[in-house]
């Protein structure tokens, strides 16, 4: 596998005999100034990589918690350009990989080349586009790779086995294994078949595997680790904690939750 910021991070974490903690944060919820502080707080409290959502008005893969966060961020005037500006200002302070989570529409509106160029300029290491089918991934993957950005592809429990192998072989940085059928959101338990899917992916690709959608507490992180995955992505649970905290406590709440989750990674 090609050496990139993300692959080097996974290699380092593997040597430490633990899994990667990969929190998801919606950019601009409640505002970009707070997002910037939370990014640094997550880094300080053990996040290995951060998935940063670009808000979009029709987020098909997301459940109500992240949909509401996107809506609040859009109401606050968040746009891809403003997210890039914030990341540029943080570039010297952020030492861990930042992975942008964006739907196809904002990418197409800006132009694939322009989006990837701006992302690389501000230090972005990866890109996740949940509504991008495998058949349309090659062009974006090539553009992203030329800017040293990994295009990460998603595999779901309903993905046929042959297609799963193709996705894992095409995905760069890691393969994003969706742990549930349906949209993002907190779950009380994870689906039993995810462990066997992790093994299937391990058998067909050397790419690291990160499990996301529904990962919301220490118990889930431990489960993901037991399955043999390489990383756990925690989204809705963190977004909810930030939303429920007072404006003065949002940054601290994000940091303390991250610290709690990080302790379960080894």
Curated annotation (Swiss-Prot):
Principal EC category: lyase
SUPFAM superfamilies, sorted: Ribulose-phoshate binding barrel
SS bond list: none
PROSITE patterns linked to this entry: TRP_SYNTHASE_ALPHA
Record-annotated active site: 51, 62
Pathway named in the protein's UniProt entry: Amino-acid biosynthesis; L-tryptophan biosynthesis; L-tryptophan from chorismate: step 5/5
Catalytic activity: (1S,2R)-1-C-(indol-3-yl)glycerol 3-phosphate + L-serine = D-glyceraldehyde 3-phosphate + L-tryptophan + H2O
Annotated GO CC locations: cytosol
Task performed by this protein: The alpha subunit is responsible for the aldol cleavage of indoleglycerol phosphate to indole and glyceraldehyde 3-phosphate.
Subunit structure: Tetramer of two alpha and two beta chains.
Alphabetical list of PANTHER family matching this protein: TRYPTOPHAN SYNTHASE ALPHA CHAIN, CHLOROPLASTIC (PTHR43406:SF1), TRYPTOPHAN SYNTHASE, ALPHA CHAIN (PTHR43406)
Protein name: Tryptophan synthase alpha chain
